[in-house]
Curated annotation (Swiss-Prot):
Organism: Petroselinum crispum
Name of the protein described by the UniProt record: Polyubiquitin
GO molecular function: mRNA binding
Lineage: Eukaryota, Viridiplantae, Streptophyta, Embryophyta, Tracheophyta
Propeptide residues according to the Swiss-Prot or TrEMBL record: 457-458
Keyword annotations: Cytoplasm, Isopeptide bond, Nucleus, Repeat, Ubl conjugation
Main location as per UniProt: cytoplasm
């Protein structure tokens, strides 16, 4: 059947569709006709925004129905704001909007003055001068709107030493906020504070109102010992070592403690938890290692093995490695020998490009294997090309590559002749002689590939 799509400029587009087409399909057809990427399209019918996965039939869209097309500003996105009454407000925002801007939009919609609004996301109160991007608020995130009661109230916090602190708070303050106020007054970091009221330990994301804490209530403050805890380390001989650690200890620190107890040099230690080899710079907290967790200690045999790395110039480098070395480690060894930064190195073995986090063992690289080193030219970067079928192709390119070059790379990967390719970026069709830099296409940008029908009239 035919339907019509009306744009804000007043232009009407005619599309051939079927009732079973999804909104994604319709947006792809609009992209074919108009070159507008689907992620910049919002379709409205009968006052409702249409969701990608649903079909025309779901919305009772019939032949000769008219949809309205609204363009999302680049970086533009929708977020939701939920009030304490349960009402949800939808806002059009951009990542660069400040919290002030968002409060002004809420005022426009709901009439609530910004100075009475407190916005909460992920248990944190948002500060006016910061942006949505600062808080990693992404499209379709939900913020919570709490109204500031004019005035607030006082509560008391009693420490184990018997000292009482007075705080100015509001019922809508979260426990995080209260701990931050205690830190301001007393210098105690929030992660060392435990607050107790009516015999219950209070959770960070909840509000005072949630716990029915009212004016002049008294909370009790108990100090958490600095993340201190015991963990166990089990060796292959079956021996178990007990260590005193903190969540913030790095794996290096833990290996040093093992050396103190057992005399094993850190460079011969490999620590395993939950089947994963632990990396030196990371902390116990990063791996969610908690009190009384058991790590497994495997000794690295001194010696390892030799492998060869062959460069495009024909030079061969010899490296001392171990099967458990990651590709990152190997690149670091190449940097030590040759001075080539890891981010300019691509390593190939058995025709496969090797990924940084994987080990030599993962790729079955054994002693005296030969890897091939290809240099990524500076300015080299990856971009993505998305086809109408939804497939995404990854290409290695440079900013100075022309659109012709990119089409040739797509032909190499996919077999599609360049004269059948149309590339779209930011709603624009890209011209052959221009470069990626001309269009401000940067690393990890996504281009859209539309096929020119043979004999088409583009």
């Amino acid at each position: 059947m035919q339907i019509f799509v009306k744009t804000l400029t007043g232009k009407t587009i005619t599309l051939e569709v079927e009732s079973s087409d999804t909104i994604d399909n319709v947006k792809a057809k609009i992209q074919d006709k108009e070159g507008i990427p689907p992620d910049q399209q919002r379709l409205i019918f009968a006052g409702k925004q249409l969701e990608d996965g649903r079909t025309l039939a779901d919305y009772n869209i019939q032949k000769e129905s008219t949809l309205h097309l609204v363009l999302r500003l680049r970086g533009g996105m929708q977020i939701f704001v939920k009030t304490l009454t349960g009402k949800t407000i939808t806002l059009e925002v951009e990542s660069s909007d400040t919290i002030d801007n968002v409060k002004a939009k809420i005022q426009d919609k709901e009439g609530i003055p910004p100075d009475q609004q407190r916005l909460i996301f992920a248990g944190k109160q948002l500060e006016d001068g910061r942006t949505l991007a600062d808080y990693n608020i992404q499209k379709e995130s939900t913020l919570h709107l709490v109204l500031r009661l004019r005035g607030g109230m006082q509560i008391f916090v009693k420490t184990l030493t018997g000292k009482t602190i007075t705080l100015e708070v509001e019922s809508s303050d979260t426990i995080d906020n209260v701990k931050a106020k205690i830190q301001d007054k007393e210098g105690i970091p929030p992660d060392q504070q435990r607050l107790i009221f009516a015999g219950k330990q209070l959770e960070d994301g909840r509000t005072l109102a949630d716990y029915n804490i009212q004016k002049e209530s008294t909370l009790h403050l108990v100090l958490r010992l600095r993340g201190g805890m015991q963990i166990f380390v089990k060796t292959l001989t079956g021996k178990t070592i007990t260590l005193e650690v903190e969540s913030s200890d790095t794996i290096d620190n833990v290996k040093a403690k093992i050396q103190d107890k057992e005399g094993i040099p850190p460079d011969q230690q490999r620590l395993i938890f939950a089947g994963k080899q632990l990396e030196d710079g990371r902390t116990l907290a990063d791996y969610n290692i908690q009190k009384e967790s058991t790590l497994h200690l495997v000794l690295r045999l001194r010696g390892g093995m030799q492998i060869f790395v062959k460069t495009l110039t024909g030079k061969t480098i010899t490296l001392e490695v171990e099967s458990s070395d990651t590709i990152d480690n190997v690149k670091a060894k190449i940097q030590d020998k040759e001075g080539i930064p890891p981010d300019q190195q691509r390593l190939i073995f058995a025709g496969k490009q090797l990924e940084d986090g994987r080990t030599l063992a993962d790729y079955n690289i054994q002693k005296e294997s030969t890897l091939h080193l290809v240099l990524r030219l500076r300015g080299g970067m990856q971009i993505f090309v998305k086809t109408l079928t939804g497939k995404t192709i990854t290409l290695e390119v440079e900013s100075s590559d022309t659109i012709d070059n990119v089409k040739a790379k797509i032909q190499d990967k996919e077999g599609i002749p360049p004269d059948q390719q149309r590339l779209i970026f930011a709603g624009k069709q890209l011209e052959d002689g221009r470069t990626l830099a001309d269009y401000n296409i940067q690393k990890e940008s996504t281009l859209h590939l539309v096929l020119r029908l043979r004999g088409g009239d583009f």
